[in-house]
Amino acid sequence: MSGKLYLCATPIGNLEDITLRVLRTLKEVDLIAAEDTRNSIKLLNHFDIKTPMTSYHEYNKIDKAYVLISKMQEGQNIALITDAGTPGISDPGEELAAMCYEAGIEVTSLPGPAACITALTLSGLPTRRFAFEAFLPADKKERKLILEELKNETRTIILYEAPHRLVRTLEELKETLGNRRMTLCRELTKRHETAFHTTIEELILYYQTEKPLGECVLVIEGRSRQEMEEEQKASWEKITIEEHMEIYENQGHSRKESMKMVANDRGMTKRDVYQYLINKTEE
C-alpha cells in the first residue's frame, strides 16, 4: 500500500502559530522533506521532533521528487515543509503534488500560515476577491508584461518583494498602475510586525531616506471599475459613431447588435444611434 504526502504549513515568524495537527504529523511520518534542512532543524528541535529529514528545494525539486515518490510507493509517509508558510504558495510543493497525483499517490494539505493571506487581512483593502502574483519575474520583458496585465486588475493585488528590489518595484508600480492605496507588511506575526497603510507614491518618498529591511508583502488596491468605464467612454468619444460601429461589425456582430453596443458604450439610447446614422446617410 502506498504512503501519503502531507503538505504541512509552518509558522511565518511566530512558532506559536503551528497547528497541533502539523506537530502530530511531523512526529508520525517516516520522513520530512524540507526546503532548507538547516533552517527546519531549528523548528524540529524546538518541538522535540526526531523524524529524519531530507532536502527538497527549487534546485532539486524534479529529481528529488522521483526519489520521494519511490519511497511513498514503498509505503512511506512523507511530510513536506518549507522555510515558512504553506508549501506550493511561492515555495516548493506545486510540482511534487502534481507528480504524486500522476503516480496515484494520495496528497493532503494541512492548512496554516501564509504571508499573503495574513497581509491581506491586515491591509484594510477589499478581501473578497484578490490576485496573488508572489514575486514579479526578474526578466525585464516578462516583468513588464505582468505589470501591464495588472494595470486593469480590479481585484486587490498581492505581491512579495525582497528589500534590495523594493524601491525599483514601487517605482514600476507607480509608473504602470498610478498612485494607488496600498499596505506594506513586514515581520508578519513577529514582535516588530508592521503594516504601513499608505500609497505607492508615499512609500517611494519614505524609502528615499529609509533603507528597506526584510522581505515584505505589498497589498495594492485594484483598479476602480468606474475609472475604467470613464476611461473607455473617453476613448470612444475620440472616434466617430460610424467608426465605432465598424469596430463591432468587423468583429462579426450584426448591425442591430453593433448599434446596441455602441449606444451602451457612449451612454446613448439605441434610438439616438440609429437616428444619427440615418441623418449621416441623408447628408
Named regions from a protein language model:
Residues P92-L96, R255:
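Glycine-centered tight-turn and secondary-structure capping sites
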Residues I12-G13, D83-P87, P163-R165, R223-R225:
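Short glycine-rich anion-binding loops that position phosphate/pyrophosphate groups of nucleotides
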Residues T54-I62, L136-D139:
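Conserved helicase motor
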Residues S2, T156, P163-E283:
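A contiguous loop/helix-start segment that scaffolds small-molecule binding in enzyme catalytic cores
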Residues L26-I32, G104-T108, T156-I157:
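Short active-site oxyanion
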Residues G3-L5, E74-A79, R155-T156:
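Loop/turn-to-beta-strand initiation segments
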Residues M1-Y59:
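Glycine-rich, flexible N-terminal cofactor/catalytic loop recognition
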Residues E95-E153:
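Class I SAM-dependent methyltransferase SAM-binding "motif I" and its flanking Rossmann-like core
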